[in-house]
Amino acid sequence: MAGNTIGQLFRVTTFGESHGLALGCIVDGVPPGIPLTEADLQHDLDRRRPGTSRYTTQRREPDQVKILSGVFEGVTTGTSIGLLIENTDQRSQDYSAIKDVFRPGHADYTYEQKYGLRDYRGGGRSSARETAMRVAAGAIAKKYLSEKFGIEIRGCLTQMGDIPLEIKDWSLVEQNPFFCPDPDKIDALDELMRALKKEGDSIGAKVTVVASGVPAGLGEPVFDRLDADIAHALMSINAVKGVEIGDGFDVVALRGSQNRDEITKDGFQSNHAGGIFGGISSGQQIIAHMALKPTSSITVPGRTINRFGEEVEMITKGRHDPCVGIRAVPIAEAMLAIVLMDHLLRQRAQNADVKTDIPRW
């Protein structure tokens, strides 16, 4: 199976399945001499891991990461960093009844069409369980970007179902189970989630991720535009069906005189473009949004077929998230960090000696 690696200079390759023995990844391109411990990675893993609230799947995985290589006496050596997380709470028996049935809205049908077989236990490689390793690798990138360049990456939920959320207080995001920045909407989210659990249904969500302190000049022309790579990275997250950079699809209703980010001697006067022009960072905040579909793993009966072509009624059993957007916040942060880390290393490799006299803000 190809497609397990992202990045050029900062490269992350993941492996493992939902109900396998373990998940792992290899991180290449980490500069030497960076202080790094397992505790540095664990914080974001704890934010993503299942079973931490009544609003997410009750699969209880400690997600304790192990650093297998690439770190000596507490600092990175410049060689490949191997990371491993053991799976400890698999319940494969929950899936034995559906081994011949294609769950609607899942990758069961497409995986079998592609490979001629599939690991039906929790979705195998297509499970969002894989994203634990992205978060671990992303934590390395976030640490480097923060300590060496002052770049801060943070994400939050900005919509659940038909409930829009305003970014009113970033400090609130880590104080509630929804990663919600809007204190006026937390009760409404709680009510919605309770109703969904009672109905056995699910709901979609929108997640916003913001990078501050990104220098101007990151990104490549044409095919490796910074916004293209960010969109690629975010679209690779399970259940993501749409990505916007800056104002995204809202620009359709704007005129050029409204949408252009005008510049004065004091800097940019707006940020409709999300901090990227011509595929290259402008030095403004980089802002991206992603839309996540409602999970198809619900107890509401639905129609599908089995591998013999027979129509059957499907009710998904097991432990699942009523809204996958909640735990997607640290995953989105990780993927943005991985892309920025890669482009920063590429910029340093090619254009380290470039100096300009034009203003920076």
Curated annotation (Swiss-Prot):
FMN binds at R125, S126, S127, N238, A239, G278, K293, P294, T295, S296, S297, R319. GO terms for cellular component: cytosol. It is an enzyme of class 4 (lyase). The keyword Lyase applies. SUPFAM superfamilies: Chorismate synthase, AroC. Belongs to the chorismate synthase family. HAMAP family: Chorismate_synth. This is Chorismate synthase. It comes from Shigella flexneri serotype 5b (strain 8401).
